[in-house]
């Protein structure tokens, strides 16, 4: 079972700039992959398999942001395609717009690269960020990932995804 906690974060100026770059890079990779997949399918009738690593040689500024955020953009595009083919009423995947007032990116917790302690959160590439932790988190939960988002009013939030162990059901004999 998964549990998500959403907290307000207070990044400094350099962290805000990093988040803005990351939001832009994630949108760029998503849109670029979608465009290439559409174009390749129209030409050949086959599905193109692309990864964000392909773009880092061509666009070196993609190396400045968290690589897992770019990988999650690829996963989000794959999910959009799966949803479209599963149910056509969902609609074909759409390009992401700069004008959307809510920006976000998702990163995964690998080897403890995301840490929460003493009202501070450590994120890849961003470092330690002040956080308004208004509830405690059970120690039995395992941190799986984080989604950083910026709302239209320029407030930043983080949603932390935790995996909770399912309680084992006891089997009783009668």
Placement of each model-derived feature along the sequence:
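Nucleic-acid substrate recognition interfaces
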Residues: 1-174
């Amino acid at each position: 079972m998964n549990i998500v906690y959403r907290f307000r974060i207070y990044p400094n100026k350099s962290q805000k700039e990093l988040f803005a770059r990351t939001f832009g890079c994630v949108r760029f990779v998503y849109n670029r992959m979608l465009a290439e997949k559409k174009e390749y399918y129209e030409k050949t009738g086959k599905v193109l398999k692309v990864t964000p690593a392909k773009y880092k040689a061509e666009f070196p500024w993609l190396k400045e942001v968290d690589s897992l955020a770019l990988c999650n953009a690829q996963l989000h595009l794959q999910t959009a395609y799966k949803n479209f083919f599963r149910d056509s009423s969902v609609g074909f995947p759409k390009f992401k717009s700069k004008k959307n007032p809510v920006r976000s990116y998702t990163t995964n917790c690998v080897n403890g690269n995301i840490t929460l302690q003493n009202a501070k959160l450590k994120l890849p590439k961003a470092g330690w960020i002040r956080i308004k932790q208004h509830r405690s988190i059970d120690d039995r939960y395992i941190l799986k990932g984080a989604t950083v988002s910026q709302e239209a009013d320029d407030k930043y939030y983080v949603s932390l995804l935790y995996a909770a162990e399912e309680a084992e059901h006891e089997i009783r004999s009668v």
